[in-house]
């Protein structure tokens, strides 16, 4: 596993495990509207990336649930296959995301903005994928 991926995993894991704490950085004296340094900026960017990832996971689960429901109701004869393809597509998308954001990290590796740039990449791609899934599966 590459260093950028390890850092991203640690940052996202920390956010997911401490979502209640991370949701309110003000309790830590951090103003995400005006972070006072790189570390605070990175923490805030990590929170935003975690929120985008959580939303993506929820929409992905809705899409799979919709496909299973339509297959069970007989409304879609190929929905079981569509769900399998969606799973494969999501796994491939995750690899694409990781490689894209690792490249962003590497490009910024000599500066202090590398973690923030990677978190921005993860956030942007997660939001884009969430929109795609909503559009493809007509989810609200």
Predicted regions and their residues:
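N-terminal alpha-helical modules
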Residues: 21-140
């Amino acid at each position: 596993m590459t260093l950028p991926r390890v850092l991203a995993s640690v940052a996202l894991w920390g956010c997911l495990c401490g979502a209640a704490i991370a949701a309110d950085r003000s309790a830590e004296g951090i103003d995400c509207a005006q972070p006072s340094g790189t570390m605070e900026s990175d923490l805030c960017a990590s929170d935003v990336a975690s929120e985008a990832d959580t939303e993506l996971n929820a929409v992905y689960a809705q899409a799979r649930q919709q496909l299973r429901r339509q297959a069970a109701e007989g409304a879609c004869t190929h929905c079981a296959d569509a769900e399998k393809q969606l799973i494969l597509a999501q796994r491939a998308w995750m690899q694409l995301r990781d490689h894209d954001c690792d490249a962003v990290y590497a490009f910024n590796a000599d500066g202090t903005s590398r973690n923030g740039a990677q978190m921005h990449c993860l956030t942007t791609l997660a939001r884009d994928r969430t929109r795609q899934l909503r559009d493809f599966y007509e989810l609200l």
